[in-house]
Amino acid sequence: AMLKYYLLAVPQMAAQMPKLSTEDVTIVQLLGSKNSELHTPSEIIYRIAEKLNARPCLLFAPILVGSTQLKESFQADPAFQEVYEAIRRCDISIAGIGNAARAEELFLQGNVAIKPHLLLEPGQYVAGEIGSHIFDINGNPIRMNIQNHIIAVELEDYRKIPTRIGVAGSEEKLSAIRGAMLGPYINVLITDTRAAKLLCEE
């Protein structure tokens, strides 16, 4: 149920967006896709672009590849470089905030599980994930030895986006939301009343 909630948060936001007539707006995909996802990033990009009368800019790549060399091949492709330059020019990002279960599920492709690849410090544990970036309860990034296999906006470039919106709700997401705010991975939060109340009480 919690995974379903995460998967539906951003797609539902896209579905509820009113149609607007905008000019010179581009909607850019920030990370690669998984075939098993209920709502793929490219599908969400298309939906938002349609609502805003904007141009979609898609990242045609998987989120996880088998080697550093394969990632470098993608990065060397002119089409990829064009999309990544668009990412660097982004003014606003919108991303769901996943909890620890989502972080573990995100990269689960074939026989690749995330747990053995986490480089945890003593006492550190996974609190959440946003845009493929995994963090602890205090918002500290958790390093992975497969970082060079992931195709997504790099953390340094993501944090340069001026307005970073996180979408998440429910009491079960509190640790993830808190970590995302402390990072700070986000500077705007869209959440539900219950989660907002609990965060304010801390």
Language model segments and positions:
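Helix-turn-helix/homeodomain-like alpha-helical modules used for DNA recognition
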Residues: A1-K19
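A short alpha->loop->secondary-structure connector
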Residues: P18-T26
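Conserved phosphate- and dinucleotide-binding cores of soluble alpha/beta proteins
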Residues: L20, G32-E202
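Alpha/beta-hydrolase-fold catalytic nucleophile elbow
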Residues: V28-L30
